[in-house]
């Protein structure tokens, strides 16, 4: 049976990882390993200064005292004797669109799976109330079945964003590019009980590039967005230009 490793960044007890694991377990052998707390915004960070501790929950999920990247690395390298066939990260409670992908622990967990040689996808539910996790799980299963039949390039993952709608109201699936947000709003300054200044990150910026063809545009218009992301960050098209620039300095 096909084995799928499921992880996330919202934490191993979050509703999204349960909805995803439950949906996948009807067709695949599922191994669910997630962080013991909410790690949203953890990106590709690793825990390097503390040991990782694990705890197996009553439902069989494994909780890890680390980041999403830690979870995937530990699961593949140590926790299971049989390597999974695929890594699926999510379902994230909220969008991973445009610039979000740089900070996303959900996307990072999928990236780590791909770094370790496995096909991987990240899936997120986009909306204000976040009630239709079953819709995101449905489309995750659909994409996974397609990947198992026809794999994508080995240096890519798929970043999937699903509108928070009933399944029958989703208009279809669009392959997209990343859009862009305006810069995040400023820091929020407040005081702790002792009167000392403390700071919170401001909310993310509004869409700057949500034109046709972007992930923002697809989801806003009721479509599932599937964006191929490359693990290799090299800007290959700039190498020749950069060499000319270097030669002149």
From Swiss-Prot:
It comes from Shewanella sediminis (strain HAW-EB3). Its cofactor is a divalent metal cation. The keyword Hydrolase applies. A divalent metal cation binds at residues 9-10, 40, 92. It catalyses: a ribonucleoside 5'-phosphate + H2O = a ribonucleoside + phosphate. Pfam families: SurE. Nucleotidase that shows phosphatase activity on nucleoside 5'-monophosphates. This is 5'-nucleotidase SurE. Its main location: cytoplasm. Coiled coil: none annotated.
